[in-house]
From Swiss-Prot:
GO terms for biological process: regulation of blood pressure; vasodilation. One of its GO terms (molecular function) is hormone activity. Residues 31-40 have a biased composition (Basic residues). It comes from Hoplocephalus stephensii. Snake venom natriuretic peptide that targets both NPR1 and NPR2. Exhibits hypotensive and vasodepressor activities. GO terms for cellular component: extracellular region. Belongs to the natriuretic peptide family. InterPro entries: Natr_peptide. The keyword tRNA processing does not apply. Residues 1-8 form a propeptide. This is Natriuretic peptide HsNP-b.
Amino acid sequence: SGSKTAKIGDGCFGVPIDHIGSTTDLGCGRPRPKPTPRGS
């Protein structure tokens, strides 16, 4: 329920979880919000 495009694992699924509103553990096996790009 937010306009933030979080990515699951940032490399496992990488899909917008707009319909959920929170990062789920669908791909990596654990919830992981997308951190700020700091030289990634």
